[in-house]
Design a protein with these regions (language model features):
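Rossmann-like NAD(P) dinucleotide-binding subdomain of oxidoreductase/dehydrogenase enzymes
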Residues: 143-285
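N-terminal Rossmann-like NAD(P)+-binding subdomain of aldehyde/semialdehyde dehydrogenases
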Residues: 1-154, 182, 324
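ALDH superfamily catalytic-core signature
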Residues: 62, 177, 204, 255-388
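C-terminal segments
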Residues: 3-6, 11-25, 29, 138, ...
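Flexible, glycine/charged-enriched surface loops at secondary-structure junctions
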Residues: 84-89, 219-223, 298-302, 328-339, ...
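Buried hydrophobic positions in well-ordered alpha/beta secondary-structure cores of metabolic enzymes
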Residues: 20, 90, 112, 163, ...
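Structural signal for hydrophobic packing residues in well-ordered secondary-structure cores
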Residues: 23, 27-31, 72, 76-79, ...
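Conserved C-terminal structural/oligomerization subdomain of aldehyde/semialdehyde dehydrogenase
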Residues: 373-458
Length: 458
């Protein structure tokens, strides 16, 4: 798929206006005012569009509210209406949401990329369509019955009510779609406080969902959002008496605040997912799939592979095969140049470095250009051999740069992977034909997601 906006991969302001106008027309059902031509501006690939500091009055409606109180009150009313509907009615709502989100997956992806400047449009389209199709719906709400000498016990699922959801700038639209389908299927309503740097695409997403719900006969404002999201509005949502459950996707700070809010919280925080490759692995299969996973959306997805620990004896061949499958393998001199531009603070061995935020989620070619390294074509991933203690191994870099380090045997590789994962319990994986080794690593690292012989997004 060709990338929008020419060789830089970033949409112009004019293109953003066209996409936003098209989405507004779909939501309202009538033509929107076409944007006036803008004077030409210098192209840039590093500075994302700034989110507005206030929402104009015409931006409200279709689930978008000026205050947290208004959004929660409206969602509470909608929840009670939904609670009175049949499960069949809820199924129609979810079907309508899926249809709308699949139809608008591409435009939402382009709008998210244009606003945030992160990742790749083609991968964001995949994410939007994947969560639209695969997120569980009402079909999983199966009652469980247990009968015995003492009688019959029937267990049925019940909704919480109003859920407060906080979403990231890395995966703004796909997170909203996933949360909505899962939470509404379970009978809840939602108030979103989105990341300020992804406000425009997120508001467009909420409006489309609102339209899909009401079109299917569902209650208005079942899914709402705060028009001008801030840190303060997120804190207000977390402490609001009308919110019974929090669902937070973000960094360690916002996750920590949610976990200490006094409310029940479901949180997805930071990770540093390692992948181990041992001597029994199919190296060509491993190389191809590690590249696919680590390069996906320029590595901004929290489950993407962040470092490889390979057993010494197969490391050279693994790196060679990665090069054959399209990765750009950096030499020692190029590694030095790249680390000088991607890190603003370089603390030393086995320490997490501070990232250059302007390069998070950027294409590999842009990182190479910033480092003064010639690039041919558009490599999806940079691969580099490093020592065990290199900061790339210990830092969740969220860039298409994959460090490969080594261990003398599979046991030490698993131990190093556990250390590099920092105990987050997020994601990890392994390539091996040794069932015992696969099971041993899964038990040892004990992450929420453990992938065997495949990319982590599988």
């Amino acid at each position: 798929m060709s990338r929008p906006g020419g060789s830089t991969g970033v949409l112009t302001d004019r293109q953003v206006d066209i996409i936003a106008t098209r989405l507004a027309e779909r939501v309202s059902g009538k033509p929107a005012d076409r944007p006036a031509p803008r004077p030409p501006v210098a192209a840039t690939t590093s500075a994302p569009r700034r989110a507005p500091t206030s929402a104009p009055r015409e931006a409200l409606g279709d689930g978008v509210f000026a205050t947290v109180d208004d959004a929660v009150d409206a969602a509470a009313t909608a929840f009670h209406e939904l609670d009175g509907m049949s499960l069949e009615g809820r199924q129609k709502i979810i079907a309508s949401i899926r249809e709308s989100m699949f139809e608008n997956a591409e435009e939402l992806a382009r709008l998210a990329h244009a606003e945030t400047g992160l990742g790749r449009v083609e991968d964001k389209i995949v994410k939007n369509r994947l969560v639209t199709r695969k997120t569980s719906g009402t079909e999983v709400l199966t009652p469980q019955a247990v009968t015995g000498d003492s009688g019959l016990t029937l267990t049925e699922y019940a909704p919480y009510g109003v859920i407060g959801a906080i979403t990231p700038t890395t995966n703004p639209t796909s997170t909203i779609i996933c949360n909505t389908i899962a939470m509404v299927s379970a009978g809840n309503s939602i108030v979103f406080n989105v990341h300020p740097n992804a406000r425009e695409c997120s508001m467009a997403n909420v409006r489309l969902i609102h339209q899909a719900i009401t079109r299917a006969g569902g209650p208005a404002n079942l899914v709402t959002a705060v028009a001008t999201p801030t840190i303060e509005s997120a804190q207000e949502l977390m402490s609001h008496k009308g919110v019974r459950l929090l669902a937070v996707t973000g960094g360690s700070g916002v996750v920590r605040q949610a976990m200490t809010s006094g409310k029940r919280a479901i949180c997805a925080g930071p990770g540093n997912p390692p992948v181990v490759v041992d001597t029994t692995a199919d190296l060509d299969h491993a190389a191809r799939n590690i590249i696919a996973g680590a390069s996906f959306d320029n590595n901004i997805v929290c489950v993407d592979e962040k470092e490889v620990i390979a057993v010494d004896s197969i490391a050279d061949e693994l790196v060679q095969r990665m090069g054959h499958h399209g990765a750009r393998v950096l030499n020692e001199r190029e590694l030095h140049k790249v680390t000088n531009v991607i890190f603003t603070e370089y603390p030393g061995r086995r320490q997490r470095a501070t990232l250059e935020k302007d390069l998070i989620g950027k294409n590999a070619s842009e990182i190479l250009a910033r480092a003064g390294i010639a690039s041919h074509g558009d490599p999806r991933l940079l691969v580099v051999r490093v020592s065990n203690g290199h900061p790339l191994v210990w830092t969740e870099q969220m860039m298409p740069i994959l460090p490969i380090t080594t261990a003398p045997d599979v046991e030490r590789a698993i131990e190093l992977a556990k250390e590099a994962e920092h105990g987050f319990g997020h994601s990890a994986g392994m390539y091996s034909r040794d069932i015992d080794a696969l099971s041993r690593m899964a038990r040892t690292i004990n992450t929420s997601i453990f992938t065997k012989n495949g990319p982590f997004f599988a």
